[in-house]
């Protein structure tokens, strides 16, 4: 992979997501079929208002969404995919291993392992301080 520093402004050029649903802050490594990105988790996240006010924990499904968005940055940054959308088509073998709380920095790693036409399969994992927080296999459909 190639070490890069893609900031949120550049991420927003690839992804259609916006606040409060943009869950990727920076890309730090990228290759043809692999990406590593960062999500800085703060108490200001809207989901913490209800999940849970006395014990804020990032919902696991949003960790998977952050991983999906990281993979989306990679796919939508390719010139042939400019202006297209990536749709979440499924999750398999998802495991949540560590609670993610305000102040954590999620390191998001996604690797495309299979493609067939507009469908792609990605192995993804999120870590905090080098410890696995979540992992799973994500399926995407590229469309307009």
Curated annotation (Swiss-Prot):
A Pfam family: FabA
Top-level EC class as recorded in UniProt: lyase
Entry's EC annotation: 4.2.1.59
Catalyses which reaction(s): a (3R)-hydroxyacyl-[ACP] = a (2E)-enoyl-[ACP] + H2O
Active site, renumbered: 51
NCBIfam families per record: fabZ, PRK00006.1
Keyword Metal-binding among UniProt keywords: no
Keywords for this protein: Cytoplasm, Lipid A biosynthesis, Lipid biosynthesis, Lipid metabolism, Lyase
Family: Belongs to the thioester dehydratase family. FabZ subfamily.
Compartment(s) where it occurs, according to its Swiss-Prot or TrEMBL record: Cytoplasm
GO CC terms in record: cytoplasm; membrane
Function: Involved in unsaturated fatty acids biosynthesis. Catalyzes the dehydration of short chain beta-hydroxyacyl-ACPs and long chain saturated and unsaturated beta-hydroxyacyl-ACPs.
Protein name stated in the entry: 3-hydroxyacyl-[acyl-carrier-protein] dehydratase FabZ
Keyword GTP-binding: no
Upper classification of the organism: Bacteria, Bacillati, Bacillota, Bacilli, Lactobacillales
GO molecular function: (3R)-hydroxyacyl-[acyl-carrier-protein] dehydratase activity
GO biological process, one term: fatty acid biosynthetic process
Annotated TM spans: none
Domain of life: Bacteria
């Amino acid at each position: 992979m190639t070490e890069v520093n893609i900031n949120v402004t550049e991420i927003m050029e690839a992804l259609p997501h916006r606040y409060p649903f943009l869950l990727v802050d920076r890309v730090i490594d990228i290759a043809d079929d692999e990406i590593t990105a960062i999500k800085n988790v703060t108490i200001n996240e809207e989901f913490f208002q209800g999940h849970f006010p006395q014990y804020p924990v990032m919902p696991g499904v949003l960790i998977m969404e952050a991983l999906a968005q990281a993979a989306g940055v990679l796919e939508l940054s390719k010139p042939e995919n400019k202006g297209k959308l990536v749709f979440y088509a499924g999750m398999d073998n998802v495991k949540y291993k560590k609670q993610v709380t305000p102040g954590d920095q999620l390191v998001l790693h996604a690797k495309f392992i299979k493609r067939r036409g507009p469908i792609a399969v990605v192995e993804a994992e999120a870590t905090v301080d080098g410890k696995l927080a979540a992992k799973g296999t994500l399926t995407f459909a590229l469309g307009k």
